[in-house]
């Protein structure tokens, strides 16, 4: 590597340049080659290595290079054979333009030693460019008045080639008007031109299309063309000419103003202003013509501007002229003859006199609606008139006299289908062409009250939650009346039905205009489950028409009643219940029972029992049944247990939110040999438990007798009213019997509230009531019960079947098919290992049935009145001291039914069970009265004995 004097390589390019310059002088030489333009790639140009005296083997070692000096890679050298060839397309016109000489200058540089050779490659021209005109089309405008031999210069073509290839010759397409003037070689300044050799006529030849062709002198010849479009300009050398010299037109005498008479047409062969024509009447036209006709100056249309009368003038002769706008102007003339024709120019005239408008839709057929008269001023056939009516209408025209008609009713009317008719009466004369006139008759159809209000459906079902606010909107009834005005004005009212002492108006009301139904008082599901009534819709027509719709209002239950405790509460114990238990009892022994009832339904009435946390400790040897409320021992009692146990039992329903009640049970543990001289049930202010219980039983018996008497009187009154009522005057839809019970246990009594279904509608009344006295099995029957054992005297242990005469309420009978028994042994069973909880199962009997047990519902969808009663023998276990007698509850009402366990040899008086609503009732009254007295004595003795046992 060479370095400069400062020791860096910056001096190397300078040194290399000096060496190249030196070798240039030593090895300079020049070669000449030629190649035609547009030669293909690889075309041989020359053996450059051989011509330069270089060996083929030294081309690569000596770094043979070819420099075209900015000409690109048009030429290239094959280093294997030293041949110079064409590498890419060579276009002479692109390289040198129109220059006569065109060469490519090359430099060949070889190294070791450095030599430079000059090579000139001449590019020879070929005829590869055709002649080209400046434009493909040339427009020439020549007036038809130009004289002969007029010359019009043209622009020639150009050829990019040179020499013979650029030598052009011209020729013109054959025609009779022009020839081509081509300058000779001595007239280079004179341009190419067209020479006119025949006069032009625009009307004959408005345009000429010529083709000018240029041909070069190359081999092969190439040509170029240009279209010559020659437009001949017009001169005013033609006058306007009409199609005809005489136009004949016929017009009726009643032609209207503005009617086009004729449109004479004139044409001018000239164009532009020379061909624009102006129409007018001739100057010698009469004033009468000018008063009746008008001619448009531009279009030449003649129109009527005055009245024409055949009797006044039968023909009008109109001279017309057409003048162009050329200079000088030229004119053409014609005549228009207008003949007036007598025609039927008077149309019929209609006169209508209406008599009965509007027409009632119940009008009789043939009713005259209007009188029509027609007139025509013409004579003969032109004055003969016929009338017609709009088709497909319930009316017709009846001819009564010449040119007189009556419009009468032809078919029955229905305003609800069509409320009005627009009739068109057409009168047509016999002229040719006939003339007609029309008149409209509006016929309104008056409404009659022939449509009753109609409801969308015959019955509606509405669900309303209980405890609604008074005046609450519960539903809206709507009836549609197809009539109009007063006949369609609907008012609503309740179909009044009295339900005992209460009227339907005390429950609901309906707005007379809007049809909105309102609850007048808070509805109570426990009192009223279904309110069925009818709403009447009546229009204001004469006579008024109406229709009824049935509304079934179901009152949905809400948890608005807390559980009510039925456990007897003695005076002096602050509402607590006292029980005595022997210390010798073992585990799983029932020592007491907490009884509660919920007036709600479904889940809202499903009760569960549990001990309060403060009393449910491990040291307390008692537990309470989750669904039975029975208090039983969890283990055997011993001396370490406190002699007095205070239990707090929480009674909770399953409503949302849940409501609760708390019962306090005081359990006293006594020894087996200890006589209960005093009891926590005793009161400080009481003279003795026996006296208190006896007094209470007396009052209870009196109350039962009073209630029974009231029921008997009610039944008798109902029977009388039913027998005297019409079969169609039912106040209640067919319903199910309602169970009414009363019972006495210990020193308290409760009676079930009466659950009603208040209905108002068609159908006979039905009120089936049933009552039974305390201490009896709830089986009904008068003669069928003979020989049936009591609930406590059944020694076989099989469940006792209810008497077929037992009649359930609607909800109770519904529960017979899907009841769930929560048995004492099926819910919680105590054992040595602690309580064993089992889920309720659907069954008809349990391993340890309890006489008179009622099964509570499992789901919220089961009504509390749908529980199934079971009757069977009592629990074989003997009741412990202080244990309450077995009972069953009817959820949904505060009623409690006691099933007393009588001795095995005791006999139940069948007459103590009374069933109301039976046909045999009147035959058994005396027998039942005796049975009631005997049973009351027995009950009084049993109650005294039971109290003393406790």
Curated annotation (Swiss-Prot):
What function is annotated for this protein? Answer: Potential calcium-dependent cell-adhesion protein. May be involved in the establishment and maintenance of specific neuronal connections in the brain.
The record's CDD domains line, in alphabetical order, gives: Cadherin_repeat
Question: Per UniProt, what is the membrane topology?
Answer: Single-pass type I membrane protein
In Swiss-Prot or TrEMBL terms, this protein is called Protocadherin alpha-9
Name one cellular component (GO) term. plasma membrane
Keyword RNA-binding annotated: no
Source organism of this protein record:
Pan troglodytes
Q: Where in the cell is it found?
A: Cell membrane
Q: InterPro entries from the xrefs? A: Cadherin-like_dom, Cadherin-like_sf, Cadherin_CBD, Cadherin_CS, Cadherin_N, Protocadherin/Cadherin-CA
Q: Which GO terms describe its molecular function?
A: calcium ion binding
Residues annotated as domain Cadherin: 30-133, 134-242, 243-350, 351-455, 456-565, 588-678
Region annotation 5 X 4 AA repeats of P-X-X-P: where it falls in the sequence: 734-894
Question: Signal peptide position in this chain?
Answer: 1-29
| Main localisation | membrane
Which keywords are on file for this protein?
Calcium, Cell adhesion, Cell membrane, Glycoprotein, Membrane, Repeat, Signal, Transmembrane, Transmembrane helix
**Which regions are annotated as PXXP repeats?**
734-737, 799-802, 832-835, 873-876, 891-894
Give residue spans, biased composition: Polar residues.
Answer: 789-798
> Which positions, given as ranges, span the membrane?
698-718
**GO biological process: any one?**
homophilic cell adhesion via plasma membrane adhesion molecules
Point out the glycosylated residues in this chain: 254, 265, 548
Origin: domain of life = Eukaryota
């Amino acid at each position: 590597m060479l370095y400069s004097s400062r020791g860096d390589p910056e001096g190397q390019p300078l040194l290399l340049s000096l060496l190249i310059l030196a070798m240039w002088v030593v090895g300079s030489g020049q070669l000449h080659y030629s190649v035609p333009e547009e030669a293909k790639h690889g075309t041989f140009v020359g053996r450059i290595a051989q011509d330069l005296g270089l060996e083929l083997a030294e081309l690569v070692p000596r770094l043979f290079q070819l420099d075209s000096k900015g000409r690109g890679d048009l030429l290239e050298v094959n280093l294997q054979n030293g041949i110079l060839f064409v590498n890419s397309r060579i276009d002479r016109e692109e390289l040198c333009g129109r220059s006569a000489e065109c060469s490519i200058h090359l430099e060949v540089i070889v190294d070791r030693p450095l030599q430079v050779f000059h090579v000139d490659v001449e590019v020879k021209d070929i005829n590869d460019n055709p002649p080209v005109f400046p434009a493909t089309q040339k427009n020439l405008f020549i007036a038809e008045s130009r004289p002969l031999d007029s010359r019009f210069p043209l622009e020639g073509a150009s050829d990019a080639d040179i020499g013979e290839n650029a030598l052009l010759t011209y020729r013109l397409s054959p025609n009779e008007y022009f020839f081509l003037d081509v300058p000779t070689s001595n007239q280079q300044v004179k341009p190419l031109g067209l020479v006119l050799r025949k006069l032009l006529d625009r009307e004959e030849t408005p345009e000429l299309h010529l083709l000018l062709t240029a041909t070069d002198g190359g081999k092969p010849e190439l040509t170029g063309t240009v279209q010559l479009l020659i437009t001949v300009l017009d001169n005013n050398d033609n006058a306007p000419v009409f199609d005809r010299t005489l136009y004949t037109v016929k017009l009726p005498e009643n032609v209207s103003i503005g009617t086009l008479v004729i449109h004479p047409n004139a044409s001018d062969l000239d164009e532009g202003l020379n061909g624009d024509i102006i129409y007018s009447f001739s100057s010698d036209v009469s004033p009468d013509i000018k008063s009746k006709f008008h001619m448009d100056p531009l279009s030449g249309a003649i129109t009527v501007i005055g009245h024409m009368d055949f009797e006044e003038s039968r023909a009008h002769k109109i001279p017309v002229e057409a003048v162009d706008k050329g200079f000088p102007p030229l004119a053409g003339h014609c005549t228009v003859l207008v003949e007036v024709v007598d025609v039927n120019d008077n149309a019929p005239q209609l006169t209508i006199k209406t008599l009965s408008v509007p027409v009632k839709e119940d009008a009789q057929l043939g009713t005259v609606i209007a009188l029509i008269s027609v007139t025509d001023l013409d004579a003969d056939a032109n004055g003969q008139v016929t009338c017609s009516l709009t088709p497909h209408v319930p009316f017709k025209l009846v001819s009564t006299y010449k040119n007189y008609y009556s419009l009468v009713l032809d078919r029955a009317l229905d305003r609800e289908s069509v409320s009005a008719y627009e009739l068109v009466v057409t009168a047509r004369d016999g002229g040719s062409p006939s003339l007609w006139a029309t008149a409209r008759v509006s016929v309104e159809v008056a409404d009659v009250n022939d449509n009753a209000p109609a409801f969308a459906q015959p019955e509606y079902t509405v669900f309303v939650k209980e405890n609604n606010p008074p005046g609450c909107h519960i539903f809206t009834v709507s009836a549609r009346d197809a009539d109009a005005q007063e006949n369609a004005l609907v008012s609503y009212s309740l179909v009044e039905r009295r339900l005992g002492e209460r009227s339907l108006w005390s429950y609901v009301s309906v707005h007379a205009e809007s049809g909105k139904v309102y609850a007048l008082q808070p509805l109570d599901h426990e009192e009223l489950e279904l309110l069925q009534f009818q709403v009447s819709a009546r229009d204001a027509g004469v006579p008024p028409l109406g229709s009824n719709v049935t509304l079934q209002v179901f009152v949905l239950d809400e948890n608005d009643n807390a559980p009510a405790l039925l456990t007897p509460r003695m005076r002096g114990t602050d509402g607590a219940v006292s029980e005595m238990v022997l210390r010798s009892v073992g585990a799983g022994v029932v020592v007491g029972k907490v009884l509660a009832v919920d007036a709600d339904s479904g889940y809202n009435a499903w009760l569960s029992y549990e001990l309060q946390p403060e009393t449910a400790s491990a040291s307390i040897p008692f537990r309470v049944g989750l669904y039975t409320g029975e208090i039983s021992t969890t283990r055997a009692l011993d001396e370490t247990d406190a002699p007095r146990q205070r239990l707090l039992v929480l009674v909770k329903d399953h409503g949302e939110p849940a409501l609760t009640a708390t019962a306090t049970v005081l359990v006293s543990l006594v020894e087996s040999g200890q006589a209960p001289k005093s009891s926590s049930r005793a009161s400080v202010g009481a003279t003795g438990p026996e006296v208190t219980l006896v007094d209470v039983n007396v009052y209870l018996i009196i109350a039962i007798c009073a209630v029974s008497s009231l029921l008997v009187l009610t039944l008798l009154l109902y029977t009388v009213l039913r027998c005297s009522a019409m079969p169609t005057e039912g106040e209640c839809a067919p319903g199910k019997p309602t169970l009414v019970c009363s019972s006495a246990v210990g020193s308290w009594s409760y009676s079930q509230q009466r659950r009603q279904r208040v209905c108002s509608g068609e159908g006979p009344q039905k009120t089936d009531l049933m009552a039974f006295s305390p201490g009896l099995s709830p089986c009904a029957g008068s003669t069928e019960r003979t020989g049936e054992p009591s609930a406590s005297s059944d020694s076989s242990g099989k469940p006792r079947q209810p008497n077929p005469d037992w009649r359930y309420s609607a909800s109770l009978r519904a529960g017979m098919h899907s009841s769930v028994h929560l048995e004492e042994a099926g819910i919680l069973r105590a054992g040595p290992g602690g309580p064993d909880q089992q889920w309720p199962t659907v069954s008809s009997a349990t391993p340890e049935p309890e006489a008179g047990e009622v099964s509570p519902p499992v789901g919220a969808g089961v009504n509390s009145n749908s529980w199934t009663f079971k009757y069977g023998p009592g629990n074989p276990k003997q009741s412990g001291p202080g244990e309450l007698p077995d009972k069953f509850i009817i959820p949904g009402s505060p009623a409690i039914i006691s099933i007393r366990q009588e001795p095995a040899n005791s006999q139940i008086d069948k007459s103590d069970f009374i069933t109301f609503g039976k046909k045999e009732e009147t035959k058994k009254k005396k027998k039942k009265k005796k049975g009631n007295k005997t049973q009351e004595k027995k009950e009084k003795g049993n109650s005294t004995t039971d109290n003393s046992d406790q």
